[in-house]
UniProtKB/Swiss-Prot annotation:
Pfam families: Intron_maturas2, MatK_N. PANTHER family: MATURASE K (PTHR34811:SF1). This is Maturase K. GO terms for molecular function: RNA binding. Keywords: Chloroplast, mRNA processing, Plastid, RNA-binding, tRNA processing. Usually encoded in the trnK tRNA gene intron. Probably assists in splicing its own and other chloroplast group II introns. Belongs to the intron maturase 2 family. MatK subfamily. InterPro entries: Domain_X (IPR024937), Maturase_MatK (IPR002866), Maturase_MatK_N (IPR024942). It is found in: Plastid, Chloroplast. It comes from Linum perenne.
């Protein structure tokens, strides 16, 4: 009976057999998409040669679809409570595998549209745009001319049917949509706590297992932003008749090399560059901010535009009081782990048009990017590196490891911090490095059952010199003969090769996981 119950979802009328997704799910293996010309030109994630460490490949999806088509495996959709516990866990594993397959299928139409946008706008694919730091040079250039910024959380639908409705525009195959609804319904029976008012938190912290929900949520966000940008173009139509945008490669999926981490970037950073400089929009980690130049009334209007759009078009509840409006000159904006604000003392740039002509003084406010010291200390406290007031303590859980491993772990943390917060003053990180350095010494002293003073006297102070030499190693690659290189030693440095250290922006798992970073 179970087989007959669910078999109707796999029976498609002949008129639907020409649909795009039908041969992928029911007739052919999914690896046929690797031969699609449009996907291969830009290096699609589907055609990457993934290794064993990635734990997922097209071969796994191929086997999954083959097993789905076998009659004996229709019983995986059954949720009989009398089944053995081991079999129920096996069913959950099947649902997770189906989720990965559905995410791959649903992503294809969206990826094709993104590739067409690249071709139409003649955007050259740049590896630097994949870096988390790539947005900060843009902010330095644009926010210095703006006055106000509005920040808040993007509301999310409380019912998963809204996510299914959002994907209808991209997928015309009704059988796939029915299968998607069936998947949601059956999985909610396995985990009654899944569908709750914490949907967005669930999506953030269950990145690897439930990629289908990540795909659907990204499509839902894309629909929101499409209407927002349409309204924006109508408002600024007389100022700019054409609006171009720069869409990062990690907008919809994270990195091509990491298929298992397709949505590990948690919706990624979306950077839209408008010709009109009076409004800029950015989205990150389920949050947004609007920056504008002019009076507070203008940014307030956009705030209520967003609220009405969410409530009237997408039927999601948004609280206007949770959307904050601040002045850039008086308040700092917490953005991707930095506290960004405009400096109180504007810089003066003196320019001269031609020789022997008069000089022109131009004033420009400088964007200050500071490190949230108290947030980092709080994260260190949760990771058991220090107490509430910032006094270093030993790490007992690491005391059983070899001395070299303990030192390497602490040095790795300092390197991550130095790389990510290279855009701020190096003096600001000294306190954090000091805490980690003493925590390392206390951990080693605890292991050898000695005091910190005796341990350092016996081994010498040069034991931990690696903690403060990372920046010198990087900057030593730049010759110091020119005046430009001299300024690099004093100014901020943005690394455009940080592709996967997203935990740094939220201070979660920062001190346990080393980011995937290419060599500088």
């Amino acid at each position: 009976m179970q087989k007959e119950k669910y078999k109707k979802y796999f029976e498609i009328d002949g008129s639907f057999k020409k649909s795009f997704l039908y041969p992928l799910i029911f007739r052919e293996y999914i690896y046929i998409v690797t031969y699609a010309r449009g996907l291969n030109e830009y290096g699609s994630i589907f055609s990457e040669n993934l290794g064993y460490d990635n734990k997922l490949s097209l071969l796994i999806i191929k086997r999954l679809i083959t097993r789905m088509n076998q009659p004996d495996h229709f019983k995986i959709l059954s949720t009989d409570s009398e089944q053995p516990t081991l079999f129920r866990y096996n069913n959950i594993l099947y649902f997770q595998m189906i989720s990965v397959g559905l995410a791959t299928i649903i992503e294809i139409p969206f990826s094709l549209k993104s590739l067409c946008s690249f071709e139409r706008l003649h955007i050259v694919k740049s590896q630097n745009l994949r870096s988390i730091h790539s947005i900060f040079p843009f902010l330095e250039d644009k926010l210095a001319h703006l006055n106000y910024v509005s920040t808040g959380l993007i509301p999310y639908p409380i019912h998963l049917e809204k996510l299914v409705q959002a994907v209808r525009f991209w997928i015309k195959d009704s059988a796939c949509l029915h299968l998607l609804r069936l998947f949601f319904h059956e999985y909610s029976n396995w985990n009654s706590q899944f569908i709750s008012n914490k949907l967005i938190s669930f999506i953030f912290f269950c990145k690897k297992e439930f990629k289908t929900f990540m795909v659907l949520y990204n499509i839902y966000i894309y629909e929101n932003e499409s209407i927002l940008f349409f309204l924006r173009n109508q408002v600024f139509y007389l100022r700019s008749t054409f609006s171009s945008f720069l869409l990062e490669r990690n907008f919809f999926y994270e990195k091509m090399e990491q298929f298992t981490e397709v949505f590990d970037n948690c919706f990624g950073i979306v950077l839209w560059l408008f010709k009109d400089t009076f409004m800029h929009y950015a989205r990150y980690q389920g949050k947004f901010f609007l920056a504008s130049k002019g009076t507070p009334l203008r940014i307030k209007k956009w705030k209520y535009y967003l609220v009405n759009l969410w409530q009237c078009r997408f039927f999601v509840w948004s609280q206007p009081e949770n959307i904050y409006l601040n002045s850039l000159s008086k308040h700092s904006v917490h953005f991707l782990g930095y506290l960004s604000s405009l400096g109180l003392n504007p810089s003066v740039f003196r320019s001269q048009m031609v020789e022997n002509s008069f000089l022109i003084d131009n004033r420009k406010c400088k964007l200050d990017t500071k490190i949230p010291i108290f947030s980092l200390i709080s994260a260190l406290e949760k990771a058991k590196f220090c107490n509430a007031v910032g006094h270093p303590i030993s790490k007992p859980t690491w005391a059983h490891s070899p001395d070299s491993d303990i030192i390497d772990r602490f040095v790795c943390i300092c390197k991550n911090l130095s790389h990510y917060y290279s855009g701020s003053s190096t003096k600001s990180l000294y306190r954090i490095k000091y805490i980690l350095r003493l925590s390392c010494v206390k951990t080693l002293a605890r292991k050898h059952k000695s005091t910190v003073r005796i341990f350092l006297k016996r081994l010498g102070s040069g034991l931990l010199e690696e903690f403060f030499t990372e920046e010198k190693r990087i900057l030593s690659l730049i010759p110091r003969t020119s005046s430009i290189s001299q300024r690099l030693y004093k100014g901020r440095v943005w690394y455009l090769d940080i592709v996967c250290i997203n935990e740094l922006a939220h201070h979660k798992n920062l001190f346990m996981k080393h980011g995937n970073r290419n060599s500088p």
